[in-house]
């Protein structure tokens, strides 16, 4: 008998990742493909199918019982559609329907859609930095900026699955126009492409042969480049303003930040915490702890699996097999050797 596994997809503006995950949260297989973010809807779906094909090639696929799909948002978990701001070709795109139509997805499997940042929040609360925390904001800062909320010890996803979408809180009413249609969104200051663009505008020049990415800007900032440092300071200030506003609204105990840009460490967290001290000044928002995500770049995958498990028992499951093991102290996660920031 094949060991039961959950499948997971994590679709973002830079990459499409997939994994097979056992009931303890351990990744037993993985596949990945670059996101053709400016491609057609068909190009994008072909990339998703490429990842599914890669997972289906593993023997563990035969034990698939549930399939979770985390996507950049907005998403609509009621209709199974996605409209990622940083993937223009997908607007109200029927992602769940298309994933279910893949020939290797078993007939009884119904993909469960969740926003990528909500998935990250589910993962960090189940087995990461927010484990045991009653009220937390978990953020993904990468090609875009997203968030998920833990309120009263439970994941709060909202009616359509978009609660916590902090990347599109306005932090500057006269700020740059966002692809979402609003001005001054957090994402236009703190996402990887925005950081790289502002660093260039501030005088940073990447080394010859090096692409102008947030990762390259972080390296330059650590070396003291003023333009790169200014870009990360600007990002930290925008994130701090949004975090302080969220804390004032729902009273947070903890903020967890993951995603590619968060891999820059104190280059981002230093200015963020400094600006947060200026913005979060009320008694119940002051001294709010900001911590890096514990599950690194696998949080979206683990969260997608957790969402799939929470949706109900898999086909043919025994009573003890209806959910991931919440009592497991911490999943054994095989992290990829490489990390990448939103570009």
Locations of regions flagged by a protein language model:
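Glycine-rich phosphate-binding loop of actin/hexokinase-like ATP-binding domains
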Residues: 133-189
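Glycine-rich phosphate-binding loop and adjoining helix at the ATP-binding site
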Residues: 41, 45-49, 53, 62-67, ...
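Short glycine-aspartate micro-motif
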Residues: 6-10, 63-68, 136-140, 146-148, ...
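A mobile "lid/hinge" subdomain adjacent to the ATP/sugar-phosphate binding pocket shared
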Residues: 186-256, 288-289
């Amino acid at each position: 008998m094949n060991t039961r596994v959950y499948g997971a997809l994590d679709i973002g503006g830079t990459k499409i990742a997939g994994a097979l995950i056992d009931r303890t949260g351990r990744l037993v297989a993985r596949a990945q493909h670059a996101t053709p973010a400016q491609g057609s809807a068909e190009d994008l779906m072909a990339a998703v199918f490429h990842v599914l094909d890669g997972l289906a090639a593993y023997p563990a696929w035969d034990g698939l019982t549930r399939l979770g799909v985390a996507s950049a948002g907005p998403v609509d978990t009621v209709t199974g559609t996605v409209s990622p701001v940083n993937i223009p070709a997908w607007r109200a795109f029927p992602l769940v329907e298309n994933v279910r139509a893949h020939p290797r997805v078993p007939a009884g499997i119904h993909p469960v859609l969740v926003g990528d940042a909500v998935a990250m929040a589910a993962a960090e609360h189940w087995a990461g930095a927010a484990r045991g925390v009653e009220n937390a904001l978990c953020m993904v800062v990468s090609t875009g900026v997203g968030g998920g909320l833990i309120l009263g010890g439970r994941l709060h996803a909202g009616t359509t699955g978009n609660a916590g979408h902090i990347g599109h809180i306005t932090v500057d009413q006269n700020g740059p126009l966002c692809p979402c249609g609003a001005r001054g969104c957090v994402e236009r200051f703190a996402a990887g492409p925005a950081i790289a663009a502002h660093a260039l505008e501030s005088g940073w020049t990447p080394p010859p042969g090096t692409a102008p990415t947030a990762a390259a800007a972080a390296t330059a900032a650590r070396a003291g480049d003023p333009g790169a440092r200014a870009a990360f300071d600007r990002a930290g200030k925008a994130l701090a303003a949004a975090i302080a506003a969220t804390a004032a609204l729902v009273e947070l105990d903890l903020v967890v930040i993951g995603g590619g840009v968060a891999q820059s460490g104190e280059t981002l967290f230093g200015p963020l915490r400094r600006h947060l001290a200026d913005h979060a000044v009320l008694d119940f928002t002051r001294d709010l702890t900001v911590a890096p995500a514990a599950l690194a770049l696998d949080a979206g995958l683990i969260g997608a699996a957790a969402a799939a498990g929470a949706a109900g028992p898999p086909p043919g499951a025994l009573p003890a097999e209806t959910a991931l093991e919440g009592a497991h102290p911490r999943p054994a996660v095989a992290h990829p050797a490489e990390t990448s920031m939103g570009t």
